Design a protein with these regions (language model features):
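Cyclophilin-like peptidyl-prolyl cis-trans isomerases
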Residues: 4-10, 18-199
Length: 199
């Protein structure tokens, strides 16, 4: 009887260990790109940044970003708002040379419903900018330059930087002016966005 009890306890312990191992593998795989996971290379006059999208948590947002990139909507726009240690923001058509309207006030002419999720806003995370209305995102996006956990579950995180952190740092270190101290003194232009697939 005693031996049977020990065997049962051993079996339970092994099952628990396997379950934990399985859970850990799932957690690790969650951050690994699946075959064909879409990526984009944001080409700028400061260098390239490659981002990997998260269609599993923000499908509409990812589709919208890809659509606008294919339409060359972002080409010639700029990172018009830069706050070191917080984020760099771009994607506004009003930031293009010769455009009417103030940078930061433009969009594609429609809004995308928010897809708030459990992905943390940490350095390198790609997220959508918006107005006070949670469903007012359009084309403007930002790349976190530091921890911005106060944005978690309030802004749509939809991807992360997988290369080009040195470019992010270079842009974030540009001297800025203005009331908020976020207007770059040098133009950081998005020359194009190239869509690729993870291998």
């Amino acid at each position: 009887m005693k031996n049977l009890r020990l065997c049962l306890l051993s079996a339970v312990a092994i099952m628990a260990a396997l379950t934990l191992s399985s859970c850990n593998n799932k957690e690790q795989m969650k951050d690994s790109p699946a075959a064909g996971t879409p990526r984009a290379i944001i080409h700028t006059n400061y260098g390239d940044m490659t981002v990997e999208f998260w269609p599993d948590v923000a499908p509409r947002t990812v589709d919208n970003f890809i659509k606008l990139s294919r339409e060359k909507f972002y080409d010639g726009s700029a990172f018009h708002r830069v706050i070191k240690g917080f984020m760099i923001q771009g994607g506004c058509p009003n930031s293009k040379v010769g455009a009417r309207g103030a940078p930061g006030t433009g969009g594609p002419g429609y809004m995308v419903k928010g897809e708030f999720n459990n992905r943390a806003h940490v350095k390198g995370v790609l997220s959508m900018a918006r107005a006070s209305d949670p469903d007012s995102a359009g084309s403007q996006f930002f790349v976190c330059h530091g921890d911005a956990s106060f944005l978690n579950n309030k802004y749509t995180a939809f991807g992360k930087l997988v290369s080009g952190e040195e470019v992010l740092n270079k842009i974030a270190n540009i001297r800025c002016v203005g009331m908020e101290g976020s207007t770059p003194t040098e133009r950081v232009e998005i020359t194009s966005i190239e869509l690729v697939e993870a291998k």
